[in-house]
Structure formats: C-alpha cells, structure tokens
Amino acid sequence: MRIDNRELNQLRSISFERHYTKHAEGSVLVSFGDTKVLCTASVESGVPRWLKGKGKGWITAEYGMLPRATNTRNQREAARGKQSGRTQEIQRLIGRSLRAMIDLSKLGENTIYLDCDVLQADGGTRTASVTGAAIALIDALESIQKTKKLKADPLIGLVAAVSVGMKDGEAYLDLNYEEDASCDTDLNVVMTQKGEFIELQGTAEEKPFTRAQADDMLVLAEKGIAELIAMQKTALGW
C-alpha cells in the first residue's frame, strides 16, 4: 500500500472539467490527484513561416507553473527573463504528443496553441498536461469545424500520458511528488488510443533498471493509459 493508500497499479483520482474558461476554443481543468493543470486551446488563422503555402496546419504548446503551484513560491519565468530547460523540454513533449492526434494536412492553414498552466503540482504535471490538453484540442477542433468547415475530419485519435516508477524492485503507476522524488527509476510514457508509443522518457537515479523492470513499467503504463483514454472518452461524451 502506498502513502496515499493506493495499490501499486492504481491511478490517482482523475477528473476533467471541460469548458473551464469562456474565451478559449477549448479549455479543461485536469486533476491527477492533487496535481491540477489548466489546459486551454486557442485557434488562430495562419501557420509558421516555414509552413506557409503548404496547406497544412500546426499545433504547438506552452507550459508553465504558477508561482505558488509548489510548497514554496517560485519566481515567474517571465520575471527571470528566460525559460528553464525543464520548461522547454516539457512544452516540446506536449506539442509532439498532441501533433500525433491530428492529420495536419487536413487542418488547413490554422494553428492551435495549447497552453498548460500548472495551478498545483504534486507530481506528473507533464503527463496531466498531455492528457488534459488532448481534450481541449478536440474541443478546439469542433470550434474550427463549426466556423471554417474543414473538408475532412483531421482527428486521428486520442493520446494520454502517465508516469511509472520502480522502487525496491516494484513498479508503481502514476507517481505523486513524494514517490517521484524517492523512486529508483521514473518513466513518463505517452501513447495513442491504439496502444502505440509516442514518447518514452526514463531515468534511473543511483540504481540502474533491468530490461525486465522496464517491461514491468511499460505494461503498467499501458494499463494506466488505457484507463485514462476511457476516462477521456467519458468526459467527451463518446
């Protein structure tokens, strides 16, 4: 039994609150336990310069944490004048993950910006961001369909993400902050609803992991992501 009384293979309490803000074409407040992230999707006509004239769209993401998302205040990155390497890494991960949901050739020359703002952090902010932003992206697509009438549906399918870890030879699903800080290995996994992998990010701390342990973590991640995608479908009314 874990510190929050979950089983090793159990997700935290997950929720999605759609249409959380009124201005964005898509907005979702996603909660993975005590981790809460506001994900908004904004649609703009036009694409980056290197895509102009190609008839394709673009999807990109930004990520940030509110100053008091953690137990001590962190200075805003805007006040520091630069983004941290961690922030840049995470927002690239989110963008890559969400582009796997969409056939960009069917999006027209439109750009969708996904903004993921961490309101409260207790581990798994990047995986919560991917999973929540996927729903916001679908709501934004519906907005485009209503106003611009795309010739074909660009949606390929849902994606979701979860963290897994290895501690004392046992695999843990959906790590909170304390678990993430104390695990021998932590791994972030992003997958499609077809069970295909988009991203694997794994690191061992002090104690390397074996191939068998990697397989154990991936099996657990597949289970968790299948459950998350089922929850996404419920939230979307599918």
UniProtKB/Swiss-Prot annotation:
Quote one Gene Ontology molecular function term.
3'-5'-RNA exonuclease activity
Q: EC number(s) on record?
A: 2.7.7.56
Read off the Pfam families from this record.
RNase_PH (PF01138), RNase_PH_C (PF03725)
Residues binding phosphate, per UniProt: R86, G124, T125, R126
UniProt superkingdom? Bacteria
Query: What Gene Ontology terms for biological process does this UniProt record contain?
Result: rRNA catabolic process; rRNA processing; tRNA processing
Enzyme kind, highest EC tier = transferase
The catalysed reaction is: tRNA(n+1) + phosphate = tRNA(n) + a ribonucleoside 5'-diphosphate
Keywords, sorted A to Z: Nucleotidyltransferase, RNA-binding, rRNA processing, Transferase, tRNA processing, tRNA-binding
Q: What does this protein do?
A: Phosphorolytic 3'-5' exoribonuclease that plays an important role in tRNA 3'-end maturation. Removes nucleotide residues following the 3'-CCA terminus of tRNAs; can also add nucleotides to the ends of RNA molecules by using nucleoside diphosphates as substrates, but this may not be physiologically important. Probably plays a role in initiation of 16S rRNA degradation (leading to ribosome degradation) during starvation.
Q: How does it assemble?
A: Homohexameric ring arranged as a trimer of dimers.
What HAMAP family does this protein map onto?
RNase_PH (MF_00564)
State the family it belongs to.
Belongs to the RNase PH family.
Q: What is this protein called?
A: Ribonuclease PH
- Source organism (scientific name): Psychrobacter arcticus (strain DSM 17307 / VKM B-2377 / 273-4)
